[in-house]
Amino acid sequence: MALLTGNADRAFSSYSFNKLENLCEVQTKKGFFYRKAKLLHPDEDLCYLARLDDRTRFVIINVGGIKYKVPWTTLENCPLTRLGKLKSCNNYDEIMNICDDYDVSCNEFFFDRNPSAFRTIMTFLTAGKLRLLREMCALSFQEELVYWGIEEDHLEWCCKKRLQQKEEEAAEARMYEGEMMFSETTQCAFQDNNWLSLCMRNLRDMVENPHSGIPGKIFACISISFVAITAVSLCISTMPDVREEEDRGECSQKCYDIFVLETVCVAWFSFEFLLRSIQAENKCAFLKTPLNIIDILAILPFYISLIVDMASTKNSSKPGGGAGNKYLERVGLVLRFLRALRILYVMRLARHSLGLQTLGLTVRRCTREFGLLLLFLCVAMALFSPLVYLAESELGAKQEFTSIPTSYWWAVISMTTVGYGDMVPRSIPGQVVALSSILSGILLMAFPVTSIFHTFSRSYSELKEQQQRAASRQMHQLEESTKLAGGGSSQWITAASPPDAAREDGRPELDQEAKRSC
């Protein structure tokens, strides 16, 4: 039994509970923990605790099988809490409205609540310190605070920040899941009446969600195969013999095969982009997506090259087309650069790779850390480049550091610990500067990398949980569609319920899922 001494002068627990009147009352369950306590302690004589002097000075509180002997003066300090209301109870019915059970013989109050959370709350009532438990979900602890009548404002600032963060995450997940479940329920209810919406839905699942079924997996495999073929053809097109034929204006069978292969790949990518644009509800938002912008930058150079080649052929056949050919030759350099953008097709793998999606999300979230890393690098580069130039300028035998701008390259390579060896300090002062730049580069680059690593881990966990929720939602949708297919028209009416009903039905499961994610 835990004995908690009271605090007569109220130095630690003089808190205001004016706002607790708005807290909702929680219904209690009767008799469960009283019987449990009897089973746990069958041979223990509890009546000896019910002495007359102890009953006037102490109260016994049994929470989850753990007993606390608390002075009444401690509970009087917080009269608006659930425990503080015990002092003002005048009859048995009022007591049973506050606790789960009550033993009159030994003046023991039973509460069927979490004992770990109550230990923290009891510490707050006696010492005035309220903190979250690491082993307990923050949202579950919030429910315990509401039950016992404790305000969240009394939490320590770090714990309050953690609780607010979990509340925001749970609210976002609840809203997102509610909207998704309602939209899917509505689509299932009216799929027979709207054939076009059913086709658009299946098309969206096929091109956007590889885990939606066999068509989505086949589509993703074909897309990945074409990306790999494009990367291989780009590498082959840069071979010396192919480049020589292209410079001479000749076209061998190998060059022709590469062109045909590239044409087939671009045709597939164009077809895929067209399908994605058709199923998109908001066309403007679709075009602003980074991956779609990459698709446009990778596809357009091929068509621009075809148009320019056709124009150069027409101009060369005309008598006065020499000036046009010169202009096209100038444009040829730009076209070669545009054709090199075909390597951007590799970024399309991010549609099907959780790791690449995590990398992109980490880069977007860590822009400040990357800017800080770049700032550290620039400051160190501006510091060590003049020093190594001044240290090596006295060496007249072989001076590799001809100016401060040329020393910038050496400083960057040294601080990143790459060390190509093209520029090496020869003098002892220059070597001391080089050693300092290497050590400072290791230390300066390690500071932001730690934060970036934690962001990457958190982003990966979030995307993985989101993927698992999507898979569970698809399983739920499949089960609902199976029930609707075999249940008749009465279940179709149930599936087409209004949005409020759909969200209320799914809310408890979403709350439990949000708590598990904590």
From Swiss-Prot:
Keywords: Cell membrane, Ion channel, Ion transport, Membrane, Potassium, Potassium channel, Potassium transport, Transmembrane, Transmembrane helix, Transport, Voltage-gated channel
Biased composition (Basic and acidic residues): 501-518
Chief place where the protein resides: membrane
Functional note: Regulatory alpha-subunit of the voltage-gated potassium (Kv) channel which, when coassembled with KCNB1, can modulate the kinetics and conductance-voltage relationship. Modulates channel activity by shifting the threshold and the half-maximal activation to more negative values. Potassium channel subunit that does not form functional channels by itself.
Cytoplasmic side: 1-214, 280-290, 353-367, 461-518
Similarity annotation: Belongs to the potassium channel family. G (TC 1.A.1.2) subfamily. Kv6.2/KCNG2 sub-subfamily.
Intervals of motif Selectivity filter: 417-422
CDD domains linked: BTB_POZ_KCNG1_2
Region (Disordered) location: 473-518
Spans through the membrane: 215-236, 258-279, 291-311, 332-352, 368-389, 432-460
Intramembrane parts of the chain: 405-416, 417-424
Compartment annotation: Cell membrane
Subunit structure, interactors included: Heterodimer with KCNB1.
Gene3D superfamilies linked to this entry: 1.10.287.70, Potassium Channel Kv1.1, Chain A (3.30.710.10), Voltage-gated potassium channels. Chain C (1.20.120.350)
Membrane topology value: Multi-pass membrane protein
Protein name per Swiss-Prot or TrEMBL: Voltage-gated potassium channel regulatory subunit KCNG2
Organism domain of life: Eukaryota
PANTHER family listed in its UniProt record: POTASSIUM VOLTAGE-GATED CHANNEL SUBFAMILY G MEMBER 2 (PTHR11537:SF90), VOLTAGE-GATED POTASSIUM CHANNEL (PTHR11537)
GO cellular component: membrane; voltage-gated potassium channel complex
InterPro entries, per the entry: BTB/POZ_dom, Ion_trans_dom, K_chnl_volt-dep_Kv, K_chnl_volt-dep_Kv6, SKP1/BTB/POZ_sf, T1-type_BTB, VG_K_chnl, Volt_channel_dom_sf
Gene Ontology MF annotations: potassium channel regulator activity; voltage-gated potassium channel activity
GO aspect biological process, one term: potassium ion transmembrane transport
Extracellular-side segments: 237-257, 312-331, 390-404, 425-431
